[in-house]
């Protein structure tokens, strides 16, 4: 029996199926269905939402540390020093 060359071994290992976490379908559904992250921390986490239509006019539905809430979602103002 001939010894196996390192190149043959590398070829076999590269062709072996690699484990994959989740599926692309789950990733895209999560991206489409979940609102974007909030740009600033919400003042109060008492107005929850699942869609933009559930929030009053000036507020936006976004994902924060306390859940998916309606907030002003304004970008934080950086002070110049």
From Swiss-Prot:
Q: What domain of life does the UniProt record list for this protein's source?
A: Eukaryota
Its annotated function is as follows: Putative acid-stable proteinase inhibitor.
What is the gene name? Wfdc13
Q: Where is the signal peptide?
A: 1-22
Q: List the disulfide bonds.
A: 38-62, 45-66, 49-61, 55-70
An example GO CC term for this entry is: extracellular region
What is the organism lineage in this UniProt record? Eukaryota, Metazoa, Chordata, Craniata, Vertebrata
Keywords tagged on the record? Disulfide bond, Protease inhibitor, Secreted, Serine protease inhibitor, Signal
WAP domain residues: 31-74
For this UniProt entry, what is the primary localization, expressed as one broad class? secreted
Q: Where in the cell is it found?
A: Secreted
Identify this protein by name. Answer: WAP four-disulfide core domain protein 13
**Gene Ontology molecular function: any one:** serine-type endopeptidase inhibitor activity
